[in-house]
């Protein structure tokens, strides 16, 4: 995923562990070709920095309404 495409609140799939996460920070400089992105895993209190190439955006219909989708967070999730 390109760093320019990453927006706060975007739902993404992490390639290394196939978990769904939410972008909670702007991409930060790491190397000229890679940026670090702060994410929060869904249904978890865990935050991590991931390299932007390890993230894939979920389809638009699985995004929050602010990003053009229809996803609604379940009541019993964190």
Model-derived segments and their meaning:
Residues 4, 16, 22, 35, ...:
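Intrinsic disorder/low-complexity segments
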């Amino acid at each position: 995923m390109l760093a320019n495409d990453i927006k706060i609140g975007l739902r993404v799939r992490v390639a290394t562990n196939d978990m769904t996460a939410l972008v909670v920070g702007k991409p930060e400089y790491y190397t000229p070709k890679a940026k670090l992105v702060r994410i929060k895993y869904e249904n978890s209190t865990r935050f991590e920095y991931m390299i932007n190439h390890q993230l894939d955006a979920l389809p638009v219909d699985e995004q929050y309404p602010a990003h053009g989708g229809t996803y609604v967070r379940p009541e019993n999730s964190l």
